[in-house]
């Protein structure tokens, strides 16, 4: 064989690996493009409206349970409550949506823990891609089913939303865990093995920002189309459900390219999947009579692995700092969106079309924030990652502060509809920047080979706060029947997060993560 032939073969293999690395990143973009409208459009706008709408249709006046909520009898200022479980308990119609959010996140947390351990154990990028598609299909079909409910099926609405949100949680964790793997593989292919560690930081930030912007771009397209769909159904009770149907179809269709794009990051050795997984099993030798995998053990491994990861995280100072800060931040940022939608509908009496327009403004500015903050502002002013997060939080804290002003002034402080449009721009910029920066920061301080499990910790921290936040706001609204009081809660949380974030050192965290990955037991590392 001539040297020319050998060089041609080497070049062919190199080109193959580069193309595969590029396809993996494209597949990662497809994950964001397909699923982001669910959380940005459905969860943030349509589902809260549907839950409140169904609750109002089935609710009664708070001071007289014999009068239906939508009855013209009584004062327009009368608040409404919904009777649950044969009227054993009554909750505010706005609180009902918040309680369902809390329950959905609890279910999401349980399923994320169970699945993430299996994904890390299997260690195959292609398997992670299958997980993205499988759970995406179930989530998309559940979303489509929501659009077919009638307004008396309030428990079915809650149940389908819980399933869909649980599926989104899984693909969110698995998708985020693929980011550092794809970044490092891309750098290895481009430099043919060796690469500078500093390039990981910059490329991770760029790809994460592009992914976030693509996700918001898809959400923007969905919202614009939804505006026309809702306008065509103006005056109909099914106007919101038509928009939900479109979200479900979008999710289902655009995730399909991942089937062909996402593949293993290296040329794989031909090993049967069950053999590979068996070699990684935390319970070696425990298989059924047919020699197949014992899935009970694999499901429990997710919990065992998470417990071990929390033990490892205790050794990683900056991981713990980040998780504590993120618990506080997420409790406020994620809850404030759904609360604002409920507030706009209940207190400002905004139409569905107006709320979709607000959502469009939020999405457009989130796209700008995802690009401008990490790639331009942070670079121009030479902010560290932790400093960037702190400035975003300070920016976002103005939103609840402005809502609090409404207790003291009649002319402003979320007293008029136009104020919601202005705050949508403000909120969108902070949300986009936070989405891009937070993912990239955390991906830099997790031990290599434990991405899925540590991102499940990130998600559990996020979701744990999302269980607590809506639940507490729901209790507050039940007590006061005035959702404006929740702005005090949000502002306090954002202020509390600042001193915690001030302690974060990303360089130190990355160094500690690399050191920990070297001392992890062999059974806990991903096989390359």
From Swiss-Prot:
Residues 1-98, 152-153, 232-241, 340-352, 410-417, 507-528 are cytoplasmic. SUPFAM superfamilies: MFS general substrate transporter (SSF103473). This is Autophagy-related protein 22. The keyword Membrane applies. Residues 120-130, 175-210, 263-318, 374-388, 439-485 are vacuolar. Belongs to the ATG22 family. One of its GO terms (biological process) is amino acid transmembrane export from vacuole. The chain crosses the membrane at residues 99-119, 131-151, 154-174, 211-231, 242-262, 319-339, 353-373, 389-409, 418-438, 486-506. The keyword Transmembrane applies. Its main location: membrane. InterPro entries: Atg22 (IPR044738), Atg22-like (IPR024671), ATG22/LtaA_families (IPR050495), MFS_trans_sf (IPR036259). It is found in: Vacuole membrane. It comes from the Eukaryota. It comes from Saccharomyces cerevisiae (strain ATCC 204508 / S288c) (Baker's yeast). It is a multi-pass membrane protein. Pfam families: ATG22. The modification Phosphoserine is found at residue 278. The gene is ATG22. Vacuolar effluxer which mediate the efflux of leucine and other amino acids resulting from autophagic degradation. The release of autophagic amino acids allows the maintenance of protein synthesis and viability during nitrogen starvation. Keywords: Amino-acid transport, Autophagy, Membrane, Phosphoprotein, Transmembrane, Transmembrane helix, Transport, Vacuole. One of its GO terms (cellular component) is fungal-type vacuole membrane.
């Amino acid at each position: 064989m001539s040297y020319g032939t050998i060089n041609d073969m080497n070049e062919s293999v190199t080109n193959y690996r580069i193309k595969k690395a590029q396809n993996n990143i494209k597949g990662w973009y497809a994950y964001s493009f397909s699923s982001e409208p669910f959380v940005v459009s459905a969860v943030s706008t349509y589902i809260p409206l549907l839950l409140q709408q169904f609750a109002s249709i089935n609710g009664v006046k708070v001071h007289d349970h014999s009068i239906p909520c939508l009855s013209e009898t009584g004062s327009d200022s009368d608040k409404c409550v919904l009777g649950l479980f044969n009227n054993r308990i009554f909750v505010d119609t706005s609180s009902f949506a918040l309680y369902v959010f809390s329950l959905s996140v609890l279910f999401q947390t349980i399923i994320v823990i169970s699945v993430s351990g299996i994904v890390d154990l299997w260690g195959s990028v292609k398997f992670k891609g299958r997980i993205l598609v499988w759970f995406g299909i179930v989530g998309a079909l559940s979303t489509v089913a929501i659009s077919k409910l009638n307004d008396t099926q309030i428990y079915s609405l809650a149940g389908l939303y819980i399933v869909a949100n649980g599926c989104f949680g899984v693909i969110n964790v698995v998708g985020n865990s693929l980011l550092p793997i794809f970044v490092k593989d891309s750098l290895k292919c481009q430099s043919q093995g060796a690469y500078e560690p500093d390039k990981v930081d910059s490329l991770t930030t760029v790809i994460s920002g592009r992914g976030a912007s693509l996700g918001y771009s898809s959400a923007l397209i969905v919202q614009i189309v939804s505006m026309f769909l809702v306008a065509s159904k103006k005056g109909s009770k099914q106007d919101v459900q038509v928009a939900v149907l479109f979200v479900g179809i979008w999710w289902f269709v655009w995730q399909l390219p991942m089937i062909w794009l996402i593949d293993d990051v290296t040329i794989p050795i031909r090993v049967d999947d069950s053999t590979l997984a068996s070699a990684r099993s935390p319970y070696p030798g425990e298989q059924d009579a047919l020699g197949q995998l014992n899935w009970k053990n694999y499901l429990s491994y997710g919990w065992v692995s998470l417990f071990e990861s929390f033990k490892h995280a205790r050794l990683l100072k900056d991981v713990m700092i980040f998780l504590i800060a993120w618990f506080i931040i997420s409790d406020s940022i994620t809850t404030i969106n759904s609360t604002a939608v409920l507030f706009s509908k209940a207190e400002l009496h905004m139409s569905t079309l107006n709320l979709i327009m607000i959502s469009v403004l939020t999405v457009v500015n989130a796209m700008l924030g995802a690009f401008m903050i990490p790639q331009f502002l942070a670079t121009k002013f030479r902010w560290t990652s932790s400093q960037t997060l702190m400035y975003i939080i300070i920016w976002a804290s103005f939103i609840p502060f402005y809502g609090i002003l409404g207790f003291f002034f009649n002319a402003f402080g979320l007293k008029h509809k136009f104020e919601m449009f202005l705050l949508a721009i403000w909120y969108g910029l902070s949300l986009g920047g936070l989405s891009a920066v937070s993912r990239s920061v955390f991906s830099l301080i997790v031990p290599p080979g434990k991405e899925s499990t540590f991102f499940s910790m990130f998600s559990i921290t996020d979701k744990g706060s999302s269980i607590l936040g809506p639940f507490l706001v729901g209790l507050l609204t039940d007590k006061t029947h005035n959702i404006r009081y929740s702005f005090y809660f949000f502002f306090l949380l954002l202020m509390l997060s600042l001193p915690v974030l001030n302690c974060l050192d990303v360089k130190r965290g990355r160094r500690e993560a690399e050191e920990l990955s070297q001392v992890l037991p062999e059974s806990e590392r991903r096989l390359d």
